[in-house]
Amino acid sequence: MKKSEKNVSKRSLSVKIAGISLAVMLAGISSYCTGLYDVAAKDDDVVTLRVCNWEEYIDEGGWDDDETIELPEGDIIGVNPLYKDFEQWYYDTYHRKVKVEYSCFGTNEELYNMLSLGNEYDIVCPSEYMIMKLMAENQLVPFSDAFFDESIDENYYIKGVSPFIRNTFETNEINGEAWSKYAAGYMWGVTGIVYNPQIVSREDASTWNILTNDKYFRRVTIKDNVRDAYFAAVGAIKEDLLTSDSFINAPDYSRRLVEEMNDLSPETLEKALDYLQKSRDNVYSFETDSGKADMMSGRVVAGYQWSGDAVYTMDQAEEDDFYLNFAVPKESTNLYFDGWVMLKKGIRDDAEKQQAAEAFINFISRPDNAVRNMYYIGYTSVISGGDDNTVFDYLDYNYGVDEDVDLSEDVDLSEDVDLSEDEDLSEDVNLSEDVDLFEDVDPSKDVDLSEDVGLSEDENPSETVDISETVKNMGKDDTPETVEGIDADDESDDELDAKNMMEYPLGYFFSGDADDPDYVLITDREQAERQLGAQYPSDDVMNRSAIMRYFDTEENAAVNRMWIEVRCYNIKNVPVYIWIVTALAVVAAIAVLIRGKIVERSMKKK
C-alpha cells in the first residue's frame, strides 16, 4: 500500500469513527429529548381538579387501628385523605391521572365572595340557598346524561342517594329547573337545641323560645348568622300558629309551613328584630363554632346547633361521661343540605375535567366512603346505599342493640334533676369571663349589606320551596308517652320498652317507605333523643321541617338592616338617665375647656 493510500485509509477510518460517534451522540440527544417530550406529555395528561369544600368537612385519614369499623361488607378505615384516595381510584378506573387541589371556605358568603373576586374552582360544596343563588345567576354547569345512568357501575351517587333526598332535589326548582340538574347532595340535617338534660327540661329545649328563657340567663348560645338566627326568631314569634291543630292538620300544611318560615314581611321583620334583641340580652354568646366547646365544658347548658355539630358535641362529651341530648323545636326545624356543584368558570367546557368532577362526586358517594365521612365529621350523608346495606349496617354498628339484652337497668338521666326556679346555676360558670357578644362588630365601620348573603341585583327569587311531596308518606301521628313520631302501641314494642329499647323506623330515608320493615333499627330508647335522633330525625320531625329559600336583593337588604340592629349596640335601648349623665359630662367638659382658655388669655395679658 502506498503511503498516500495508507494516509487516506486512516482519514477514512477517522471519518467513519467520527461519523459513528456523531450518530451515537445524536441518538443520545434524540433519546433525551424524546424522554423530555414523554415527561411533558405525561404532565399534560394529568387532569387538575380544583375542589373547594367546607373546613373539616371530609375524611382527612390518619385513623388509628382501633378506629376500624367492622361491618358485614368489610372493614372500613381512613388511612389517607379521601381526596387522595380518589386520585388513585380515578387512575385505576379510567387510566388517567388526576390531581386534586383541595381548599376550604368557612361560610357560604365567604365562598361567594371568593368566587366574585376571581378565585376559580371546578367543583364546590355550598348550602342549599347558595346553590339556588348560583343556579339563578347561571354560574353552574349541568351534570352530563351519563351521570344519571344507573347502569354504570361507578355511578355511586345516583344509585345510592336516599329516595328522600333524591325526591327533594328533583321536585324543587329554580326558574323552572330542578336542583338535581345542577346539584348533587353531600350532607344534610336539621337544626335544633343541644342541651344538658340534668339542668334543662326537654320541654324547655323543644321550643325556639329557649333563647329568651331567663331561667337560662347567659347559659344559652345562638348562631351568629342572619339566616339561622332569623329562622329561630320566626319560629318563636309564630309559636301559637305553628303548633295549632288547625294549622298542623291542614291538607297543605307542608307548603304553608315553608311560607310562614320564609316570611319577610315588614311586620315579621320587626317582631323578629325585637325577639333577637331580647335573645341577645339573654344568651351567653352569638357563635359560629365555639358553641360546641362551650357545651362540652359546661359553660353553657343549651345551644342552637346544626345536627351534625350536635352529634360531634354529644360524642365528645360522652367520652368524658358527660351526657347531652338533642331536641328539635316543636314549631319547625330548618332542613338544610350541602351539595356539590360544578362552576362554569372552572370547567370551561372541558369534557375531561367535567368527567373528573362527576367521578369525584361518585367516589365520595360510594357507601364505604360515605361512612368514612360520617365517622370523621359527624354529619349525615345523603347516601343510603341503594342495594348496598353498608350505611344502614353502620347505623346498626353504632346504635343497634341486641334484643336479648335488658337495658332497663341503665342510668336514667332524667332522675334526680332539680329544675326548680330557685336553683342557683351561677356557680357553674363565671359569667364575667369572655362574655363579649359584640367583639367582632365595629359600629364605626361601614357595613357591607351584601356580605351576609351576597345576592346580585338582577336576581329573581324562586317560588317558595315545597317539600310536601317529599314527606307526604310520612306519618304525622305522635303517640303519647313515646318519643315523637315513634309508635309503641303493639305488644312487641311493649316488650322492647320493658328492656328500655325501641324500634326506630328509618324507611323514609333508606327506601322511601316510612313503614318499610327492612329498615327498622332496634336501639337504646335514649338514642332517639341523642345522636341517632340528630343524625336521622324521626318522620314526625321531618314533617315539620322547612327549607329556607334565598333572598332577593330587596329582601336581602331588609334582613341585613335588621341583623345590624341586632348585632350592633342599639342606642334606642339606652336608659334616659344615661343620656342625662352623658349630656352633663359633655357640658362639664366644655365648661372646663372654656375656663382653661380664659385663664390662658388672662396670663398672656399679664
Each language-model region and where it sits:
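Extracytoplasmic/periplasmic substrate-binding proteins
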Residues: 281-349, 397-398
